[in-house]
């Protein structure tokens, strides 16, 4: 199945709009990502979000005064994004693919977010194109924030219920390198592979952070419970330690942050 068709088929049947609200790990992912967005761009500026989904980040940033251009590939998500953006004159929602940003000039945005496209780009040429295009349209000195899935967390979260053999075969080759292949809806990375994607690109690495930590794995337990007070305490702990390298691979979602080199 072609990538765009596969993505549209998935999101036609999956309600993305409340994903970051309906679970503790989703709430933590959102809070952590917004924390780093504000660290990179504390004052409202121009933001490009690629793979904007239904607008959870784009709408929030527009309400804070940022000038947001939100690009989404999936038709159902784009429909919901436009509904959620009604009344926000500083948010423009467009359909498009992160691998081709030819509609935008070089150095157009203060901050560029890719908080979803790299989950679905199994082809190396597409991954390289998405990163290069994001860097191109970001101004010199601006930040690019890219979300990735940990291949190890994919295994931990989905393949420890009597289906380990399937998880290993689907996500790793015989030498335990992460697999990326056609018809793979979600593709994961290990840390060295993820970081190597930026080798030779005109950026300076800033940090790599775990955005939801072990909460997705923990929340899968039947006896999991976390009150609002406990969540606030855990979130404070998480933000203090989420950049520590030994905690990265167990997080389902990872956030790579880099700064575009000055010309």
Model-derived features with residue positions:
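Class I SAM-dependent methyltransferase SAM/SAH-binding core
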Residues: 56-100
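A short glycine-rich, Lys/Arg-flanked "PGG" loop and its adjoining helix->strand segment in the class I
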Residues: 128-140
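Conserved class I S-adenosyl-L-methionine
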Residues: 1-51, 56, 60, 144-172
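Short alpha-helix
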Residues: 185-202, 208
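C-terminal lobe and adjacent flexible extensions of AdoMet/dcAdoMet transferase-like proteins
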Residues: 201, 209-263
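A short acidic, Gly/Pro-enriched loop at the edge of an enzyme's catalytic core
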Residues: 102-112
């Amino acid at each position: 199945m072609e990538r765009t068709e596969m993505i549209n088929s998935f999101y036609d049947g999956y309600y993305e709009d409340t994903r970051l609200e309906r679970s503790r790990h989703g709430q933590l992912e959102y809070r952590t990502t917004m924390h780093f967005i504000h660290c990179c761009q504390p004052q409202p500026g121009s933001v490009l979000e690629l793979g904007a989904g239904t607008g959870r980040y784009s709408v929030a940033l527009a309400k804070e005064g940022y000038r947001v251009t939100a690009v989404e590939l999936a038709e159902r998500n784009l429909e919901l994004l436009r509904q959620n953006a009604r009344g926000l004159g500083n948010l423009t929602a467009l359909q498009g693919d992160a691998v081709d940003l030819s509609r935008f000039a070089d150095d157009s945005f203060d901050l560029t977010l890719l908080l979803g496209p790299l989950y679905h780009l199994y082809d190396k040429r597409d991954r390289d194109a998405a990163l290069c295009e994001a860097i191109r349209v970001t101004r010199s000195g601006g930040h690019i924030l890219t979300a990735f899935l940990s291949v190890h967390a994919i295994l931990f979260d989905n393949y420890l219920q009597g289906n380990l053999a399937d998880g290993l075969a689907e996500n790793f080759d015989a030498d335990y390198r992460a697999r990326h292949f056609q018809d793979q809806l979600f593709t994961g990375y290990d840390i060295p592979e993820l970081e190597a994607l930026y080798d030779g690109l005109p950026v300076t690495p800033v940090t790599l952070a775990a955005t939801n930590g072990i909460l997705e794995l923990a929340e899968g337990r039947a006896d999991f419970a976390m009150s609002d007070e406990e969540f606030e305490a855990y979130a404070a702990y998480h933000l203090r330690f989420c950049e520590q390298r030994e905690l990265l691979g167990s997080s389902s979602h990872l956030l790579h942050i880099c700064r575009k080199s000055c010309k």
